Amino acid sequence: MDEWVRLNRANWDERAAPHAASPDYAVERFVADPDHLSDVVRFDLPRLPEVRGRRGLHLQCHIGTDTLSLARLGATMTGLDFSPAALAEARSAVEALVTRLSA
């Protein structure tokens, strides 16, 4: 792997856990409130076509909050990211949400 690719991945890997714990990303709200949408998706919503029933691929999904928000609006979403640590945080949030909904 090229050195710049390794450094870039390490940079995003290092950001994943702090971002997941940050109130700016509000991961805990996604688990607690099934209607919560990310700030990014709420901002984009007036500019987006109807997403219900559509399939979407979210590139650079990071910790998944925008991807989950689009899914909450009815899209079938797949999130991809360069950072394994970011994807692990996204999976963790979804697993916590599923556990809460199953309880």
Question: Could you tell me what each predicted segment is?
Answer:
Residues 51-103:
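Class I SAM-dependent methyltransferase SAM/SAH-binding core
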Residues 11-14, 43, 78:
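Catalytic cores of glycan-processing enzymes that make or break glycosidic bonds
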Residues 24-55, 69:
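Conserved alpha-helix/loop element of class I SAM-dependent methyltransferases that forms part
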